[in-house]
Amino acid sequence: MKFQRKYWGLLSTLGVSSAVALSACAAQARDVYVTSSASDLLKNNLVPMSMFNVSPTSSFFGSKYAGLTTYIATGSNKDDGVNVTSQTQEKLVLELATSVKGYKKKTSTASNMKTASVSSSSSSTGNNGSTEDEWEVVGSEIKRESGKGDNGKSITEDSNFQTISQQATRYEFTIDTSIKWVDNNGKPVKDEKGQEVKLSSKDFERGFEAYILSSELRFNRNGYFIDLMGLDVEKTVGMTNGKNGTQVKKMTTDSSSTQQSEEKKIEITDDNYDPEDYRSTSDDKFNVYLTSPFPFLLSMMSKEFFFPIPHTHPKVKAIKVGPNSPLVYNEKNSAKILDQTKTNFDGIYGGGGVNAWRDAWSVGPYYVESFNQSQIVFKRNKEYDDHITPNLPKTREGNEQPIPTMINYFQPGATPEVFYSNYIAGGLSSAGVSYSQQEDARSRFASTGDLRWVKVQKTAQSAQITYSSRPYILEGETVKTNSNITETEAKFLYNSESEEALTIRAGINGLINWQNLAIILLPNSGDLNYSIVPFGIFKEKGKDVQVKQKNTGQASQGSDLMNDYYYKI
């Protein structure tokens, strides 16, 4: 198989518009794409391969997972032999879901028109006793098939998107149950009866539960997404109904000599919470309930915190608290906090350090063939390519093919100069060229066609970054900066609640014209409760260009950012 040349520049999330990059080496001839990172793969990452984690799974293992939705970067590359100009656009599409319906609660007037006999015979959704008669469909999205020629569109381009995002408080996803989970050999997993294990709505429910439980135990520091979207946890993954629709437990209270029954809620952190008691009663339907409409729900479902994990896997069933659980907690001020020292991370799905991959299944574009302290080897997942890939939008080049094998090397503390040397030695498929090596790179590669200026001309790509809550860590008696952030970022995070930091954060918010952004995203609403910073928001300008300050008439020299773009999105 012949590969298209890859161009990989060191582009920051604030849109540095050009970089020098090298690509194409002997590794490509073996149908292998090799990259390297300065990260320490397992440092402070006790559960690297599931939603029950400290740092985001996507940092290293995003390729083995897939979500209800995903973003696909589409566009074009123009190569004139000297420069490569990239024009990209992100498209939000359904991935493991074949369709989604948005519902809103019917008004009380409409509900009262239902007679008691009709209400009693209505079908239950299996979620907190609610019935279909209580809900009204506001719109739906269906996965676009490649044969119909319209699978290049984003969900956001559909006429129903605005209505769903602004009104829906229940999202019903239809799951593609034809795709099978595969093991670390790329073979479909079989259960104890010899049946191949297929994707189920219960896999998403367990993924949600693992993330929520981890957050409640103060282990996962990204639990704010639950509050941000306004997830109704009880209706989505709660446990107030038994497997057969029977009530799990009731409390009986005496009030004025009258016996009143009251259903007791069992929290996810309770020892008697049953992880095999599912809200999802059908394998192909998964319902997400919100307390109020959240316009970015479909976008957020592409994040790794909401990916599925195989609910039949023994180590997935072990993600709970209580007797015989590998999770150990301490109680403080009525809150349960995970005891990381006593917890047996080997006993839960995705945990166990370098051994985690051995029994981790995949439903994404790649599976993990091997994994150790220094590298991860990914192999392309045929199941994904058979069922999902054909209906995804084409990326930059219509004839490009997926890479069969990817190898990610980890060299903690390595500098760009080290990666450049590795590329020269034939160990990497691509490398960014730092300023100090540009002259050497020109002399070595200018005539080979491997050296290019990569220019991002226009993008419509969003970037979200979540930082660790531990900017500094203790190694022995030495306090060091956490490996995933810079010293400047660590200082900012360490003092994030100080008066100076709060002033800076307020200033950053002031740079965004929220009213204009709301008009673009929510034309019928004045509210906005989630924001993203587009890739390429700032434009580069020459050192000798003078820019007039907004509303002042003063000039400024030497800045690499056009000041006008501080006020635009």
From Swiss-Prot:
A lipid is attached at C25 (N-palmitoyl cysteine). Residues 119-130, 249-260 have a biased composition (Low complexity). A lipid is attached at C25 (S-diacylglycerol cysteine). GO terms for cellular component: plasma membrane. The lineage of its organism: Bacteria, Bacillati, Mycoplasmatota, Mycoplasmoidales, Mycoplasmoidaceae. This is Uncharacterized lipoprotein MPN_459. PROSITE patterns: PROKAR_LIPOPROTEIN. To M.pneumoniae MPN_456 and M.genitalium MG321 N-terminal region. Residues 1-24 form the signal peptide.
